[in-house]
Amino acid sequence: MREAMQLVPMVIEQSSRGERSFDIYSRLLRERIIFLNGEVNDTVSALVCAQLLFLEAENSKKPINLYINSPGGVVTSGLAMYDTMRFIRAPVHTLCMGTARSMGSFLLMAGEAGGRAALPNASILIHQPSGGFQGQASDMMIHAEEILKTKQRMTRLYAEHCGRSYEDFERGMDRDRFMTAEEALEWGLIDRILTVREGEIPD
């Protein structure tokens, strides 16, 4: 069962040189589309950062599209992706399809201003970072202080990217806050809700 779930579709293209096959993600990468699908961790972060850097090297002006369907995960892994998104010169447009929770929502709102979107039935969650530690009391206090610093840093970044006050997000992230696409738009996490593909005229 696990092997079946890990199957990746292949795409076959015809050219003057014959047939070429690509896994679907490599083919989409050629279209400057990166998928963040699943938990945020060091492995996923390394892959996404590498793809961002590769696409910037190919064209530093053309937008990169980051499609997000993630329950969140490791804060430091997410911050590595955030910093890379902000570091490269190519603008990164973000789109939530499915869910963007915790660090997933953080990366969603970190996209280029005007280029952050969600599909109509997307679910977005913001909350304060969490962590656990066992050990001596003095070490636990050090880790608690570090978590508090991370919370303050992330709250400030949410406020800056979303155009709201620090206090708004401090209150909003005190507990789990689930949002519809419409609520995420109101909070400034996204700039628009996509109901049709851009450039298409609805029936």
From Swiss-Prot:
| Alphabetical list of Pfam families matching this protein | CLP_protease
What is this enzyme's catalytic activity, as reactions? Answer: Hydrolysis of proteins to small peptides in the presence of ATP and magnesium. alpha-casein is the usual test substrate. In the absence of ATP, only oligopeptides shorter than five residues are hydrolyzed (such as succinyl-Leu-Tyr-|-NHMec, and Leu-Tyr-Leu-|-Tyr-Trp, in which cleavage of the -Tyr-|-Leu- and -Tyr-|-Trp bonds also occurs)
Main localization (coarse): cytoplasm
Q: Which of the seven top EC classes does this enzyme belong to?
A: hydrolase
SUPFAM superfamilies of this UniProt entry? ClpP/crotonase (SSF52096)
Q: Please, which domain of life does this record's source organism belong to?
A: Bacteria
Q: Which GO terms describe its cellular component?
A: cytoplasm; endopeptidase Clp complex
Q: Please name every pair of cysteines joined by a disulfide bond in this record.
A: none
Q: Name one GO biological process term.
A: protein quality control for misfolded or incompletely synthesized proteins
Gene3D superfamilies to which the protein is assigned, alphabetical: 2-enoyl-CoA Hydratase, Chain A, domain 1
Keyword Protease included in the entry's annotation: yes
Catalytic site positions: S102 (nucleophile), H127
> What keywords appear on the UniProt entry?
Cytoplasm, Hydrolase, Protease, Serine protease
Please give one Gene Ontology molecular function term for this protein: ATP-dependent peptidase activity
- Is Metal-binding included in the keywords of this UniProt record? no
The subcellular location is: Cytoplasm
EC nos: 3.4.21.92
Q: How does it assemble?
A: Fourteen ClpP subunits assemble into 2 heptameric rings which stack back to back to give a disk-like structure with a central cavity, resembling the structure of eukaryotic proteasomes.
Q: What's its job? A: Cleaves peptides in various proteins in a process that requires ATP hydrolysis. Has a chymotrypsin-like activity. Plays a major role in the degradation of misfolded proteins.
Which family does the UniProt entry place this protein in?
Belongs to the peptidase S14 family.
Q: PANTHER family under this entry? A: ATP-DEPENDENT CLP PROTEASE PROTEOLYTIC SUBUNIT
Q: What is this protein called?
A: ATP-dependent Clp protease proteolytic subunit 1
Q: What is the native source organism of this protein?
A: Rhizobium johnstonii (strain DSM 114642 / LMG 32736 / 3841) (Rhizobium leguminosarum bv. viciae)
Q: Which gene encodes it?
A: clpP1
